[in-house]
Amino acid sequence: MENLEQTCASLRAQIAATEAQLAGLKRELEIAEQAAEVKAQSTTRTITAEDGKTNETREWPLLSEEYKRYGRQMIVPQLGLQGQLKLRAARVLIVGAGGLGCPAALYLAGAGVGTLGLVDGDTVENSNLHRQVLHRSKNVGTFKVDSAIEYLRELNPHPTYVPYRAHLTPQEAPGIFKDYDIVLDCTDNPATRYLISDTAVLLGKPLVSASALRTEGQLMVLNYPPRPVGDKSGGPCYRCVFPKPPPANSVVSCADGGILGPVVGTMGVLQALEAIKVITSPAVNPSASPPSLLIFSAYSTPLFRTIRLRARRANCAVCSADASVTLETLKNGSTDYVFFCGVAGLEATLSPEERISPLEFKKRHPKEVPQDGGRINKEPTIIDVREKVQFDICSLENSINIPISTILSSASSPTNVDANAQPSLPFWLPRELASADSTDPIYVVCRHGNDSQIAVRRLKELGLDRGGQRYVGDIQGGLRAWREQIDPDWPEY
């Protein structure tokens, strides 16, 4: 019996290893097929005259339909026929098919770019639809690259569209980038931004990078002109502009900070414009086109500001003569972007005793206000630490709003272990909470259950737990868990 169990275990292990190897081979095959599709792009076409007067065959640079389609932009002096031919021959890679990538891809496909590659491993969600203009309601749940390409093919069937249904990795990035002429960074996290920039520099690809959050956006054209590593006349890279990544806990996503669709759309359209300029312009003169950072602010006057960037840094880790980041370090994994950028973690993680589920909260406190209007003993106080704009969207009955930003901006007092002492409390605390006589429990809630933990720690540092006589804890999982466990009609935003 023991031998049979060992045999079964060995066979299971072999099957698992074989399946893993097969998955890797399938991924390699997909990349190879995509590369072959890119290289199969035709460069010349023979057109038959359609004037109804002759059957002669003539060599025209574009199809008759292309002249009609692109005529309005071809008569722009900065573009012309030669510019259109450059666009048709161009191979553009867009990393990220979201709020930036959708408008960028839309206008590049419309302009007649020959090959358009899209890299994204995410699927379409309802929360994407207000700003990611290539995706439609019927495509929720499908890969973003497939949803985008479906739309783009209806818009313009002439370009070759190449999907990459996975998130970009250091090992695969060089193999993908090498088949393209220019790269657009349309992502929203620092680790991927550094990876995209490093790969673009090492392979000599110009990079158009943009970002957007709330009502503001930024745009840069990097590694342009794309000179070899160590050549000071080349354009700066992302590391030249930002040698050190931002603190992991300071990075705010669109899901947490919010984003206006027209803002991210503006930045994506500007990315497409800059890509067209790079593709169609003659050889660039670095002194005539100094690198710059374009800043867009929707609620400021003027809307746009430009800051001139410095040249390549002499000690840059990727584009200087002493570069430590190489194609080899990418492929072997020794350049760890997640480690370099750090992982955002909770500043304060609470113990199980300091946390309570929404269901348990409702069991302990079935009524927040007694029916007779009187005040019951141990009446809970719910502090909602979301920002006011979110609190105004929806809030728990009788909860009070003290934004986490307000809590963190105040100086902490040492934990007060003396129940009879009067701690120095900040102005934003309601009088009933600041009262030394109150021992009613305090429950802190936020959107997902992260900020509430930090807030609980701060409140205890301020002495609100009365040396352990008063319960101060958070509602685990936040309002998302409240929706799942208590109120399925709670607004999900």
UniProtKB/Swiss-Prot annotation:
Top-rank taxon, per record: Eukaryota
Signal peptide stretch: none
Cofactor binding note from Swiss-Prot or TrEMBL: Binds 1 zinc ion per subunit.
Top EC category: transferase
One Pfam family from the record: Rhodanese
Cofactor section: Zn(2+)
Alphabetic keyword roster: ATP-binding, Cytoplasm, Metal-binding, Molybdenum cofactor biosynthesis, Multifunctional enzyme, Nucleotide-binding, Nucleotidyltransferase, Transferase, tRNA processing, Ubl conjugation pathway, Zinc
Compartment(s) where it occurs, according to its Swiss-Prot or TrEMBL record: Cytoplasm, Cytosol
Similarity section: In the N-terminal section; belongs to the HesA/MoeB/ThiF family. UBA4 subfamily.
Protein's name in the database: Adenylyltransferase and sulfurtransferase uba4
Source organism (scientific name): Aspergillus fumigatus (strain ATCC MYA-4609 / CBS 101355 / FGSC A1100 / Af293) (Neosartorya fumigata)
